[in-house]
């Protein structure tokens, strides 16, 4: 895969923006699957992670405030994980139950969009406090172990104290719904 981006900044306004593209990445891996019915399949599996686009911005506001945000798109629409022996079992079951043909171990049918908008305030050059609003479209799959959420809205609060140039202490809290 590859990554490309463009960035622009105006230091005197503390303005910075960037647009980044990450290509899909094809992975080929060896798999070890156990099955008792004697189905013989290749031990190599291919997974293609999706392409994505990120847009980020940050700008200074009066009274040592900073407005920042991100917008992200991920092309999950055609993402599938289907190990070879799992596919062989599904193909066999589909002989008797044709509706099983489309069953995949993991399959996402919708692209994902997410956004964040935040406001940060610098206090006495040592403290930074933030508040963020978050949104994620999800990918239209039910939540599971492999897909821990299907979209959310949320709010986040954070704070950071800069002790010196080599040591910071930070804490944050998000509420997602």
Regions found by a protein language model. Name each.
Residues 1-177:
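Outer-membrane beta-barrel porins/channels
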């Amino acid at each position: 895969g590859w990554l490309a981006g463009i960035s622009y900044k105006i230091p005197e306004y503390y303005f910075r923006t960037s647009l980044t593209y990450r290509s899909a990445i094809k992975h080929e891996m060896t798999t070890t699957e156990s099955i008792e019915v004697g189905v013989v399949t290749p031990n190599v599996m291919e997974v293609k992670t999706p392409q994505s686009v990120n847009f980020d911005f940050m700008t200074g506001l009066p009274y040592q405030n900073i407005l920042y945000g991100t917008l992200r798109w991920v092309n999950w629409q055609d993402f599938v994980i289907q190990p070879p022996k799992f596919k062989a079992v599904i193909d066999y079951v589909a002989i008797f139950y044709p509706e099983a043909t489309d069953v995949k171990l993991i399959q996402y049918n919708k692209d994902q969009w997410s956004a964040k908008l935040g406001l940060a305030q610098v206090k006495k050059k040592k403290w930074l406090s933030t508040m963020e609003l978050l949104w994620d479209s999800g990918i239209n799959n039910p939540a599971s172990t492999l897909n821990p959420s299907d979209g959310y809205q949320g709010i986040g609060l954070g704070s950071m104290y800069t002790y010196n140039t080599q040591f910071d202490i930070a804490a944050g809290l998000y509420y997602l719904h």
